[in-house]
């Protein structure tokens, strides 16, 4: 079996008219500006953000290319503090309050403007 040792890249696609809203959402969620962005045309624009040891890219897509929503899990040291910060931030849609699962993971969820769910969690194991 091959071991994967590189960084993880998450690519989220949106139509051009939603691009700036999605880019701004991830800028607020991650608390950083993109480390790389471009805007060559309606089908060639994007923004890349660092997320732990990986990247999250928000990319434009052609109208005829549809992708479904995804779930992204991002670990944070303090779920409750992150929840308070994002509740106070503009443009963040909270879809669930912090809860602790029976197996010890605490999380809450937000939804980006394109319908993707982001679980912000902390696990003790």
How should these model regions be labeled?
Residues 33-70, 117-122:
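Conserved short beta-strand elements that form part of the metal-binding/catalytic scaffold
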Residues 12-14, 38, 98, 122:
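A cross-domain feature marking catalytic cores of carbohydrate-active enzymes
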Residues 1-23, 70-72, 124:
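N-terminal beta-strand motif that seeds the catalytic metal site of vicinal oxygen chelate
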Residues 16-20, 72-117:
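Vicinal oxygen chelate
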Residues 25-28, 85:
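Alpha-helical scaffold elements within enzyme catalytic domains, especially in hydrolases
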Residues 27-35, 90-92:
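Conserved acetyl-CoA-binding loop of GNAT-fold acetyltransferases
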């Amino acid at each position: 079996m091959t071991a994967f040792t590189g960084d993880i890249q998450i690519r989220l696609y949106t139509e051009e008219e939603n691009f700036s809203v999605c880019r701004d959402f991830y800028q607020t969620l991650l608390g950083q500006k993109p480390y790389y962005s471009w805007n060559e045309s309606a089908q060639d624009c994007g923004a890349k953000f660092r997320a732990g040891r990986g990247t999250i890219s928000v990319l434009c897509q052609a109208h005829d290319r549809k992708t479904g929503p995804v779930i992204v899990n991002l670990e944070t040291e303090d779920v409750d503090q992150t929840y308070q910060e994002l509740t106070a931030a503009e443009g963040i849609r909270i879809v669930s309050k912090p809860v602790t699962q029976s197996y010890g993971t605490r999380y809450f969820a937000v939804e980006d403007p394109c319908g993707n769910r982001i679980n912000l969690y902390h696990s003790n194991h």
